[in-house]
Amino acid sequence: RKLSLVTGGATKEVETDETIQLKDLIGKFHKAYHYEKLGQTYLESRQFDRALEPFQEAIQRDPEMLEAKYGLAKSFHSLGRFEEAAEILEKLVKEDKKYDYGNAIFGLAECYRLSGKEEKALETYGEVINSFHFFKAYYHYARLLDKKGKKQEAIGYMKSIVGSSKDLPDYKLEKERFWIDEAYKFLRKNGIELA
């Protein structure tokens, strides 16, 4: 539950019962766990700026806390601070390459792409698609290959998205629909029609 006050056209965030309780626990116990939970609460309510400090405090108190590192990286990513997010994700992925079912290494590839580090992005997307079947990763990997002049290889990956989509259950098909449609568009643009 989040409360918002509108004053003079501006929205001001008001603390929720949960954030008040967590701040009270932090004041009493100063535990990394409570800082991390406060950061997660802010992250979930899309208050990314406010999430930074609790996550950083949690990491300072418990440098092994992967959840706090991941939350901090997600907050930086959401704020468009891709290089800072990548720096954290690089370390996290070294500790656990499969963290969050592959979403951490996928996020690292995204951060590289969004910060213009295309070579690193290409390499990291390659690692993602070797271990996980994220259509978005296949799509961006193919687009980067195309940018590098490797059109046939890119077409192959786009065909792979379309081909794999035929075996998906309905719930997964809906989740991946955007990337499947984008792959079709790419293929049509390159003169390839699929039945």
Model-derived segments and spans:
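Register position in tetratricopeptide repeats
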Residues: 44, 78-79, 114, 147, ...
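TPR/TPR-like (Sel1-like) alpha-helical repeat modules
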Residues: 94, 129-135, 143-168
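Residue-level recognition of tetratricopeptide repeat
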Residues: 40, 74, 110, 143-144
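Short coil turns that delineate tetratricopeptide repeat
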Residues: 29, 63, 97-99, 132-133, ...
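Start-of-helix register in tetratricopeptide repeats
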Residues: 33, 67, 100-103, 136, ...
